[in-house]
């Protein structure tokens, strides 16, 4: 296990940046569902059948999620014991509620991921590896909009993305500081972090509401 405080922060930062890259890719594919049903089906079919994605990248992603949460839990325990927030980015936004409640927002996001895996990943495993149903490259869009027929699910998804936005608002910029990026780039990183933290979660909310209203 990673022992030193600095090593834990760097590990937390790197795993967070890795998950941000995945989030950007996931959003890009999902957003195509509001533009083109055919394009969304093609991209989803590729991601769902490509061996590299299924048997290498997907396990790495799952490990990354678990690792990031475990590191966050360890940092939270260490911070509580020392009665100070060690994992912080000294700026106007980081000294707020956001930076003091990263663990809480992380718990909400983890709960959302549990529902998300149940909604999409578990049925996919059942479809391909338990029931051995025939390959249907056109099924992905219908499966997506079916999940967003439920207003309670849409509401929970939307609330979860609000917490994701708050989590990213602090974590994105903090990650670069933790890995030692020069202060010379701080303002640019902060601007990109805020834009990403607002626009991507808002985009996910838009996708959910769009399919609820048009499904």
State what each model feature region is.
Residues 1-215:
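Membrane-embedded alpha-helical bundles that constitute the cytochrome b-like, heme-associated redox core
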